């Protein structure tokens, strides 16, 4: 027998509590634009979707929204109902693209059933931890993902899918070792990291090393 499902708005705390209890590999996100719940006819909550700004800055253009969490108790068609409702809500608010990700090994059947399409397979990434912004491991590091989208007819082209590593995860820029310069040293693509910002600083440092100290 097919279970009839209904969509309703969810408050932030309630959606996060459901994700915390039912999501397989993610904690609740840090924020949202809106959240939705899916209920049976008896009023039992069987799933939630949390929708917010895109995590990747490549997509954060004001016209794109991301389903950052979708969690259910396994009720048939609950996921596809949430993805479809998330897009209806976003489109009515003026968004032209919605995106989400699945992990390697997930079929995406619920997304296809809701009209979404897979647009890219993304390689595994090491995670978001950085010295300037510590993040605890979440168990999702080094897992390949797939990017999915659904769009309006007038959506802008999909942006270039460059490396999604954030700036704070990149190695810190060095400062010139020649005193008293201390300018930032240009980054090198390969080889040993540069120590000096210019040839003049390199020569000055060499002379200082060779000059006998009083």
PLM ranges: what are they?
Residues 19, 32-49:
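Conserved beta-hairpin
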Residues 151-170:
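A broadly conserved sequence feature marking short terminus-proximal activation segments
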Residues 6-9, 33, 40, 52-140:
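Acyl-donor binding region in acyl/amide transferases
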Residues 119, 150-154, 201-208:
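Short Cys/His-centered divalent metal-binding micro-motifs
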Residues 4, 64, 145, 173, ...:
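A residue-level signal for beta-strand positions that form part of recognition/binding surfaces
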Residues 164-214:
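BZIP DNA-binding basic region
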Residues 141-147:
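Class I (Rossmann-like) S-adenosyl-L-methionine-dependent methyltransferase catalytic domain
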Residues 1-30:
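Short amphipathic alpha-helix that is part of the acyltransferase structural core
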